[in-house]
């Protein structure tokens, strides 16, 4: 298994083959029409961005995870994956805990947020495992009126030491 900075082709490959639920979630938040246009848009937007990573195995890329600054101290966390996510899920979770969370601490993040379509409980449970808290429901946020939940980690709520591994459940 590998976890490294993503190449544009890898972003495209994961995006064009992403899980149906991921497609519905991300497509609801973008101007694109259809899977090809969405994949091309994600490739163009994320393909050369520094904080975009790919996780995969010998068969190819499986997951793209990114963290993007929205403004000083505020970051957005995102992820999309193929149907083979379970093959790298535990490995990826460990990489996020060991690599991405410390990077966000070093960047002095005081807020990390993520929006996820209502009803995607598998992902909501995982976000909570990572230490994000369910904050609110944003009604009608999607282009077809879909409701989304906002999950966040806020330094003030976590204490002055930041988003430390000690504040996150131990990963098996």
Predicted regions and their residues:
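Conserved acetyl-CoA binding element of GNAT-fold acetyltransferases
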Residues: 72-86, 92
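Active-site rim helix/loop that mediates acceptor-substrate recognition in acyltransferases
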Residues: 28-49
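C-terminal "cap" of GNAT-fold acetyltransferases
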Residues: 77, 140-172
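Conserved beta-strand-loop-alpha-helix junction that forms the acyl-donor binding cleft
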Residues: 112-128, 140-143
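Short hydrophobic/aromatic beta-strand element in the GNAT-like acyltransferase core
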Residues: 49-54, 64, 148-150
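A short beta-loop-alpha structural element at the N-terminal edge
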Residues: 1-18, 22
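Conserved acetyl-CoA-binding loop-helix of GNAT-fold acetyltransferases
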Residues: 88-104, 129
């Amino acid at each position: 298994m590998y976890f490294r900075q993503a190449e544009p082709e890898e972003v495209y490959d994961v995006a064009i083959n992403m899980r149906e639920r991921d497609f519905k979630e991300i497509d609801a938040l973008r101007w694109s029409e259809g899977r090809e246009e969405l994949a091309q848009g994600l490739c163009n937007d994320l393909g050369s961005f520094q904080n975009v990573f790919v996780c995969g195995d010998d068969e190819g890329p499986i997951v793209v995870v990114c963290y993007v600054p929205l403004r000083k101290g505020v970051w957005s966390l995102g992820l999309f994956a193929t149907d083979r996510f379970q093959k790298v899920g535990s490995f990826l979770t460990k990489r996020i805990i060991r690599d991405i969370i410390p990077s966000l601490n070093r960047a002095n993040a005081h807020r990390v947020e993520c929006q996820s379509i209502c009803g995607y409980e598998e992902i909501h449970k995982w976000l909570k495992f990572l230490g994000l808290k369910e904050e609110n429901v944003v009604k009608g946020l999607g282009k077809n009126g879909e409701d989304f939940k906002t999950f966040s980690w806020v330094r003030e709520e976590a204490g002055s030491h930041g988003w430390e591994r000690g504040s996150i459940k131990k990963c098996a």
